[in-house]
């Protein structure tokens, strides 16, 4: 590495808000299954506090050694619906509290995996877990929850979609922060290091380390140097920048896995913004020549960004996965917030952008009087985009306040303007229930 590369890396950290967003340890809880829910809770607590005992210390040590901020240390676990199903319990709040207690003991920021996978129907534990979500998130501080309601192979479970519309409303009524820690997925991935949707898939190793990076400020600074040049130059610039960002992510992941004595999983090739000025995905898109995010051309700019981030990242790291793309959460990106406030970005345009970005309608505040069926219909629309396009899509919606209000979450979750929602009813559509079949192109065997 020559001196120019060293100074580039220093500038990325000091001036362009580059950081490692998260080191996430995935832990299998399949060996914690017990017919007695209290014994299962104790086994869960013991395994997490044993396996992840040094996670925070190692993360801090690597950050100090490399001079690169590591913002979050997190844990993801096997979907709790699988663990709870072995018990006779009628709710799984006690398991959520065990996760929360373990997370506090080891000092991590969040723990994900209070989850269920119901893309093709409910098993015993799934329905119990879903109905436990509002209380579980209200009575814990660090637990994150996710439910997968569709996949390209299975179609969309519309009964679960309807249930999740209701659950989101109930969660919002029970606590201020609960809905910010609840994601509804289609095509959820098993190795996601990002919250709130992380869970540890049953096909993963017993314990692994996954890394998520963050570098929209770095990409924007690189694009500032090629203003007015062709899209060929823009694409190459983004690709080379993504390579550098991902290379550092791989280094951190390998160091963490070696020191913790566990397998290295993946680097998630995602550009994750924060509310800080200079750390915005929206501003990267505007640097390509858009007056403001939300105007015509936004989706095309996002397509270029997303694809080149993947191309550069794949070259830099031989183990990539997770969600891998540009995140467009409204509350966590100062450029997105500004675009909503000036009227150039609405829900419909955000939905179009989710056909390309790494997740979906993320951290979006809507009026608190929005019916559960309308929320369910938003989930169905997002799931349809994911299922048809063979990509992960998700909804993390915040029904709080009235249109035009600003909802404060603080920290990385930021501030969300309450957006206008189409007032026409979707009740008859959602009340049908059943399954939307898998698309024809999913049949590949």
Curated annotation (Swiss-Prot):
Pfam family, one: DUF711
Membrane-spanning segments: none
Annotated family: Belongs to the UPF0210 family.
HAMAP family: UPF0210
Assembly information from the UniProt record: Homodimer.
Protein name: UPF0210 protein SPP_0289
Species in which this protein is naturally found: Streptococcus pneumoniae (strain P1031)
Lineage: Bacteria, Bacillati, Bacillota, Bacilli, Lactobacillales
């Amino acid at each position: 590495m020559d001196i120019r590369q060293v100074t580039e890396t220093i500038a990325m950290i000091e001036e362009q808000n580059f950081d490692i967003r998260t080191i996430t340890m995935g832990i299998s809880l399949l060996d914690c299954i017990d017919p007695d829910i209290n014994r299962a809770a104790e086994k869960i607590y013991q395994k997490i506090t044993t396996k992840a005992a040094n996670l925070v210390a190692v993360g801090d040590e690597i950050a100090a050694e490399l001079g690169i901020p590591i913002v979050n240390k997190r844990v993801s676990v096997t979907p709790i619906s699988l663990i709870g199903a072995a018990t006779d319990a009628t709710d799984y709040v006690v398991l959520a509290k065990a996760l929360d207690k373990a997370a506090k003991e080891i000092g991590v920021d969040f723990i994900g995996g209070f989850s269920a996978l119901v893309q093709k129907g409910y098993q015993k534990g799934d329905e119990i877990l879903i109905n436990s979500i509002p209380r579980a998130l209200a009575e814990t501080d660090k637990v994150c929850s996710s439910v997968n309601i569709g996949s390209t192979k299975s179609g969309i479970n519309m009964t679960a979609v309807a249930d999740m519309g209701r659950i989101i409303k109930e969660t919002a009524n029970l606590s201020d922060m609960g809905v910010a820690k609840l994601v509804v997925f289609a095509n959820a991935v098993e190795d996601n290091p990002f919250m709130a949707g992380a869970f540890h898939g049953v096909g993963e190793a017993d314990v692994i380390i996954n890394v998520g990076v963050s570098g929209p400020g770095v990409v924007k600074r690189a694009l500032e140097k090629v203003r007015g040049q062709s899209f060929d130059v823009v694409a190459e610039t983004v690709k080379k920048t993504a390579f550098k960002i991902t290379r550092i992510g791989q280094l951190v992941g390998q160091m963490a896995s070696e020191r913790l004595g566990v397998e290295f999983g993946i680097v998630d090739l995602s550009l994750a913004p924060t509310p800080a000025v200079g750390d915005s995905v929206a501003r990267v898109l505007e640097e390509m020549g858009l007056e403001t995010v939300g105007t015509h051309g936004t989706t095309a700019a996002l397509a270029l960004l997303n694809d080149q981030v993947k191309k550069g990242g794949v070259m830099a790291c031989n183990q990539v996965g997770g969600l891998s793309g540009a995140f467009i959460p409204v509350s966590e990106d100062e450029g997105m917030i500004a675009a909503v406030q000036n009227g150039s970005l609405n829900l419909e345009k955000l939905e179009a952008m989710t056909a390309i970005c790494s997740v979906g309608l993320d951290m979006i505040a809507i009026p608190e009087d929005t019916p559960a069926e309308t929320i369910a219909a938003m989930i169905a629309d997002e799931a349809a985009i994911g299922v048809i396009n063979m990509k992960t899509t998700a909804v993390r919606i915040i029904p709080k306040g009235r249109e035009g209000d600003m909802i404060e979450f603080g920290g990385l979750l930021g501030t969300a303007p309450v957006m206008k929602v189409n007032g026409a009813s979707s009740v008859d559509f959602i009340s049908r229930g059943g399954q939307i079949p898998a698309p024809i192109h999913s049949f590949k065997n």
